[in-house]
């Protein structure tokens, strides 16, 4: 599925309509994870690091339970905490269908969507940083609310 990032961002809603998205920066590695409040006490974690302490603290502070953990790519640059969230909390892991992952996950292809219960996560194939890299567009109905690019767009 083809997207123009400018179209997605230019059509983004006003900030008051945005789901609550918490950014969790690992300054040592320069990686960012995100915690998305799904609005009902459940949350989506994106690119969680293996050290879950900051994610756990953010989830506890906002009274959230992580039920989905999405990975943008196979992480040679840091160890992912997604499978740990699956084992420990029963979170459903979402990632690209490509890459030969050897753990249970919901593998998405370009344009495929996952119902998060009120919000939708759409896979967006963005190879480059890694061949199987998957970005995600967070939708509320048909309206894009956020784009998570992982290692395909480094900011800073």
What are the roles of these predicted feature ranges?
Residues 3-5, 9-10:
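Short, positively charged and aromatic/hydrophobic N-terminal segments
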Residues 11-64, 135-150:
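Conserved beta-strand hairpin/beta-sheet module of binuclear metal-dependent hydrolase folds
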Residues 29-30, 50-127, 139-140, 144-145:
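Active-site HxH/HxHxD metal-binding segment of metal-dependent hydrolases
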Residues 73, 130, 151:
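Conserved functional loop/turn residues at catalytic and ligand-binding sites
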Residues 76, 132, 154:
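Short active-site segment of divalent metal-dependent hydrolases/proteases
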Residues 150-156:
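Active-site gating loops and adjacent loop-to-helix segments of metal-dependent hydrolytic enzymes
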């Amino acid at each position: 599925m083809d997207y123009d990032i400018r179209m997605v961002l230019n059509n983004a809603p006003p900030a008051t309509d945005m789901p609550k998205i918490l950014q969790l920066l690992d300054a040592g590695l320069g990686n960012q994870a995100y915690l998305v409040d799904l609005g009902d006490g459940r949350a989506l974690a994106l690119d969680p690091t293996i050290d879950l302490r900051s994610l756990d603290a953010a989830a506890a502070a906002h009274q959230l339970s992580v039920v989905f953990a999405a990975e943008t790519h196979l992480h040679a640059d840091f160890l992912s905490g997604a499978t740990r969230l699956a084992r420990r909390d029963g979170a459903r892991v979402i990632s690209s269908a490509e890459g030969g992952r050897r753990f249970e996950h919901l593998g998405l292809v370009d344009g495929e969507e996952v119902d998060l219960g009120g919000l939708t996560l759409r896979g967006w194939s963005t190879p480059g940083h890694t061949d199987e890299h998957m970005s995600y567009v967070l939708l509320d109905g048909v309206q894009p609310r956020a784009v998570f690019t992982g290692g395909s767009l480094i900011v800073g």
